[in-house]
Amino acid sequence: MLGNSAPGPATREAGSALLALQQTALQEDQENINPEKAAPVQQPRTRAALAVLKSGNPRGLAQQQRPKTRRVAPLKDLPVNDEHVTVPPWKANSKQPAFTIHVDEAEKEAQKKPAESQKIEREDALAFNSAISLPGPRKPLVPLDYPMDGSFESPHTMDMSIILEDEKPVSVNEVPDYHEDIHTYLREMEVKCKPKVGYMKKQPDITNSMRAILVDWLVEVGEEYKLQNETLHLAVNYIDRFLSSMSVLRGKLQLVGTAAMLLASKFEEIYPPEVAEFVYITDDTYTKKQVLRMEHLVLKVLTFDLAAPTVNQFLTQYFLHQQPANCKVESLAMFLGELSLIDADPYLKYLPSVIAGAAFHLALYTVTGQSWPESLIRKTGYTLESLKPCLMDLHQTYLKAPQHAQQSIREKYKNSKYHGVSLLNPPETLNL
């Protein structure tokens, strides 16, 4: 019958095709199944931060599954890095240890090594180095053949004032082999760098009193920024040489002084103040650009010749001829030398070496009663008679210093650093 007949070739081909269609439909159903009902499939971990950046929603980070990071444990809780470590998953949350460590028999024997063998190894290690020996009974100290000098004190207990008293500032002039050469060079250069004596008469808008106010202000600037005395002397020299060639309005006189002080600071100081500091001390009267342009103009007028001999340099040489050295004499001579900077008349007509000689003699006579040394007469060629005109003018300036309108120099030398020499009473007369 038909129902019992064997299927023909056509029927088998149709059955095979139907079976293939069923398998294909089954695969499609599995692919289209709801993800919530699907079997958990292990997906590769992705960085949630990238998803947040792409979506632009900062809160999307909470909606996605954050990657699991490994918590850094303290050093004592770190797991042992051993290939024999096994972590049974059914005991991970129990009270028993989460992992067990398999120890080989050789390791057990090494752990059970008796302490005596370790002691033997330690003795062998100590015996290996001849400089190390095992602790034993202490031997008596070997007596010294010479007595130890106990007069020395520890550097930590010594008074710092003792060390400071031994320190002496180094002078570039303290080179005996070159004394004569240095002095000869300075004497030649002071003539070349000397300002014109009557230049103020050709200035249409400034006077000697304005110049005195400017120099007095520069003294305060030098004290404010802890500048060297040589810097002040150089700045005044630059100002006088510049005014000898250029006419300046009174509104620009302070700008000239500021640029001169800036140049002198760069030439003399190790750490000169910045340009902004000089703008600040003028109370922003001038801009930084104006100060720099004036600096350029001053350099051009001076032909970049900044190494001018000053009263301070000659005084430093003359101080070497004191027998004995007297700090108060040196401070008073420096005070008198700076007083000569205030008044252009009459001191512009004297060379710096002459002013320094008069200041040194007047200071020496005021403090000790001594006169111009014979050694300086031989060195400089100046006699007391040749110094007399400048000495008389400087003596009058010294007498009238308390009544002078500009008092910055007197206030400066009241300091204990200069032994308060501005408070000394000047001699009424000079026995010349």
UniProtKB/Swiss-Prot annotation:
One of its GO terms (biological process) is cochlea development. One of its GO terms (molecular function) is protein domain specific binding. The modification N-acetylmethionine is found at M1. Keywords: Acetylation, Cell cycle, Cell division, Cyclin, Cytoplasm, Host-virus interaction, Mitosis, Nucleus, Phosphoprotein, Ubl conjugation. Interacts with the CDK1 and CDK2 protein kinases to form serine/threonine kinase holoenzyme complexes. Interacts with CDK1 (hyperphosphorylated form in G1 and underphosphorylated forms in S and G2). Interacts with CDK2; the interaction increases from G1 to G2. Interacts (associated with CDK2 but not with CDK1) with SCAPER; regulates the activity of CCNA2/CDK2 by transiently maintaining CCNA2 in the cytoplasm. Forms a ternary complex with CDK2 and CDKN1B; CDKN1B inhibits the kinase activity of CDK2 through conformational rearrangements. Interacts with INCA1. (Microbial infection) Interacts with human cytomegalovirus protein UL32. Belongs to the cyclin family. Cyclin AB subfamily. It comes from Homo sapiens (Human). SMART domains: CYCLIN, Cyclin_C. The gene is CCNA2. PROSITE patterns: CYCLINS. Polyubiquitinated via 'Lys-11'-linked ubiquitin by the anaphase-promoting complex (APC/C), leading to its degradation by the proteasome. Deubiquitinated and stabilized by USP37 enables entry into S phase. Ubiquitinated during the G1 phase by the SCF(FBXO31) complex, leading to its proteasomal degradation. GO terms for cellular component: cyclin A2-CDK1 complex; cyclin A2-CDK2 complex; cyclin-dependent protein kinase holoenzyme complex; cytoplasm; cytosol; female pronucleus; male pronucleus; microtubule organizing center. It is found in: Nucleus; Cytoplasm. Cyclin which controls both the G1/S and the G2/M transition phases of the cell cycle. Functions through the formation of specific serine/threonine protein kinase holoenzyme complexes with the cyclin-dependent protein kinases CDK1 or CDK2. The cyclin subunit confers the substrate specificity of these complexes and differentially interacts with and activates CDK1 and CDK2 throughout the cell cycle. The modification Phosphoserine is found at S5, S55. Pfam families: Cyclin_C, Cyclin_N, Cyclin_N2. This is Cyclin-A2. The keyword Cell cycle applies. InterPro entries: Cyclin, Cyclin-A_N, Cyclin-like_dom, Cyclin-like_sf, Cyclin_A/B-like, Cyclin_C-dom, Cyclin_N, Cyclins_cyclin-box. It comes from the Eukaryota. Residues 26-45, 55-75 are annotated as: Disordered. Its main location: nucleus.
